[in-house]
Amino acid sequence: MIWQEKIDAALDARRVADALRRRYPVAQGAGRWLVADDCQYLNFSSNDYLGLSHHPQIIRAWQQGAEQFGVGSGGSGHVSGYSVAHQVLEEELAEWLGYSRALLFISGFAANQAVIAAMMAKEDRIVADRLSHASLLEAASLSPSPLRRFAHNDVTHLARLLASPCPGQQLVVTEGVFSMDGDSAPLEEIQQVTQQHDGWLMVDDAHGTGVIGEQGRGSCWLQKVKPELLVVTFGKGFGVSGAAVLCSNTVADYLLQFARHLIYSTSMPPAQAQALRASLAVIRSDEGDARREKLAALITRFRAGVQDLPFTLADSWSAIQPLIVGDNSRALQLAEKLRQQGCWVTAIRPPTVPAGTARLRLTLTAAHEMQDIDRLLEVLHGNG
């Protein structure tokens, strides 16, 4: 098979399965409204959970940062790209989440890949929740360490895997809030089992940070768990982009030496770090509390109104509210019908989710109003 035949065959297989991904250019994709092709839609696809992407205080911080530092960092943090703006943000994140150190990364994907690549060796073992994010599972698959996957949130299965002989170290990997189902990991139980087998715990809390817990400190804080490695991202609750790894002083020093994604990538712009500091200030404030309370009320309203629809509603009290349809074509058709009636939703299909569980991944944000939820419910009931 020549290259073009290989590529064509892969694309054809996706088309036949109604699994071909497409991008839609939008004029505005975050916030309450999505604008595309000169049309305005209620936006139920954004991860901007607290509605901070258009917050004037955060926008102003980015603008002022650009005026002070320029629009780029100019290099890797190991050369000239580590600014005082980065340093202060790392210190504030570490203090907020109760860790000795924080290290900034350009994305959550890069952070997850970097940590696993740097930490794991051939004699070690990675034990990951089977529904962990693609960045975690891909990094584990590429690692020289063997990967074992435990059934979703099944602590008993995890314990059995950890109990089998391992010549090196064991790293347990999970998410705080799962990106496709919106449910939460039983982190306290997972940490107890991990510690019983002398392992370390790595939690990706991309969808919990900023959104749940006291001052938005996330899933681990809420469950009174402190993993050895905590990954937080800034494209969801923070409304910006980027990520950080929270850890001990010695682990941070180790990652600075061996995390190639960190060493060989241009740092995020200092202006972005300034915007993230402003976002963190909002998240920790009374306004942040009010936004989280509003989001919780919207979630309650939605779940109360969707119970009698002929779809499976995931066990989620997070901003992620998946309606599991099952069939790929049915999910695509339903998403299109909702768009025609003014609600922008996204159909998620395999391989992102398991076969037979195609879904509408609905996301609610603090930018929504109660009437927006009522409109979504009205449209769903009309197409159920």
Swiss-Prot record:
Binding site for substrate: 21, 133, 352
Keywords: Biotin biosynthesis, Pyridoxal phosphate, Transferase
Keyword DNA repair: no
Protein name: 8-amino-7-oxononanoate synthase
Species the sequence originates in: Escherichia coli O81 (strain ED1a)
Pfam family, one: Aminotran_1_2
Binding site for pyridoxal 5'-phosphate: 108-109, 179, 207, 233
Lineage: Bacteria, Pseudomonadati, Pseudomonadota, Gammaproteobacteria, Enterobacterales
SUBUNIT field: Homodimer.
NCBIfam families attached to this UniProt entry: bioF (TIGR00858)
Cofactor(s) listed: pyridoxal 5'-phosphate
Catalytic activity annotation: 6-carboxyhexanoyl-[ACP] + L-alanine + H(+) = (8S)-8-amino-7-oxononanoate + holo-[ACP] + CO2
EC number(s) reported in the record: 2.3.1.47
PANTHER family (alphabetical): 8-AMINO-7-OXONONANOATE SYNTHASE (PTHR13693:SF100), CLASS II AMINOTRANSFERASE/8-AMINO-7-OXONONANOATE SYNTHASE (PTHR13693)
Source taxon at top rank: Bacteria
GO molecular function: 8-amino-7-oxononanoate synthase activity; pyridoxal phosphate binding
Modified residues (N6-(pyridoxal phosphate)lysine): 236
Function: Catalyzes the decarboxylative condensation of pimeloyl-[acyl-carrier protein] and L-alanine to produce 8-amino-7-oxononanoate (AON), [acyl-carrier protein], and carbon dioxide.
HAMAP family registered for this protein in UniProt: BioF_aminotrans_2
Entry's family note: Belongs to the class-II pyridoxal-phosphate-dependent aminotransferase family. BioF subfamily.
Coiled coil, from the record: none
GO biological process: biotin biosynthetic process
Pathway assignment: Cofactor biosynthesis; biotin biosynthesis
